[in-house]
């Protein structure tokens, strides 16, 4: 990206990582591995319940239905109840996206900057991008964000191989 000062927010299927970078140096890091309710797994579960793709789910951010369940595993019963109450699919999808954003926002609020870079599979969620753009002056999504962790591992492995002098045969 060429940026020296930014917040990297990596939202994967099972965990969330926040990295603060100042002048090109990592100055702080936090991660959440305790709960999948703030991760891609939650979006996948809810998309399955609503019988939409995660890509379709991500399109909706307007008029979200209020969802209070904080557990990715048990939130399906709340959604079924909202469907029975007559909530529209678009409102339910927006509700899922907003509930994810609501869970992520306190986690990232302790890391403030003008630039936010989203990585991990959830970075492709258009609604999340919209919500975060209200909090940051600039929101960027990495190219192929779902592979960012794997790309980093490969890059690190290549660097380590060069440092310890392993030749390629």
Regions found by a protein language model. Give the residues of each.
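Conserved phosphate-binding catalytic cores of ATP/NTP-utilizing and phosphoryl-transfer enzymes
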Residues: 1-9, 17-24, 105, 152-159
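A polyampholytic, Gly/Pro-enriched intrinsically disordered region
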Residues: 5-11, 28, 51-59, 83, ...
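Active-site nucleophile and cofactor-binding loops and adjacent substrate-binding regions
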Residues: 9-13, 31-38, 95-98, 140-150
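A short acidic Gly-Thr/Ser loop motif
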Residues: 10-15, 120-122
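Glycine-rich phosphate-binding loop plus the immediately following alpha-helix
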Residues: 23-63, 68-71, 155
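Glycine-rich phosphate-binding/hydrolytic loop that grips phosphoryl groups
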Residues: 40-44, 142-169
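Adenine-nucleotide phosphate-binding core of ATP-dependent small-molecule kinases
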Residues: 72-112, 146
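Glycine-rich phosphate-binding loops at beta-strand->alpha-helix junctions
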Residues: 108-135, 146-149
């Amino acid at each position: 990206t060429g940026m020296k000062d930014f917040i990297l927010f990596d939202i994967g299927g099972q965990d969330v990582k926040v990295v603060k970078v100042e002048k090109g140096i990592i100055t702080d890091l936090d991660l959440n591995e305790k709960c999948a309710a703030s991760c891609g797994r939650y979006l996948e579960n809810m998309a399955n319940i609503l019988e939409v793709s995660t890509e379709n789910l991500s399109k909706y951010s307007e008029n979200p239905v209020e969802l209070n369940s904080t557990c990715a595993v048990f939130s399906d019963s709340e959604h079924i109840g909202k469907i029975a109450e007559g909530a529209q699919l678009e409102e339910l999808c927006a509700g899922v996206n907003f509930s994810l954003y609501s869970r992520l926002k306190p986690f990232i609020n302790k890391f403030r900057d003008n630039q936010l870079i989203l990585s991990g599979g959830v970075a492709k969620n258009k609604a999340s991008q919209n919500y975060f753009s209200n909090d940051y002056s600039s929101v960027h999504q990495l190219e192929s964000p779902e592979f960012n962790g794997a790309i980093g591992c490969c890059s690190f492995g290549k660097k380590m191989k060069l440092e310890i002098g392993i030749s390629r045969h």
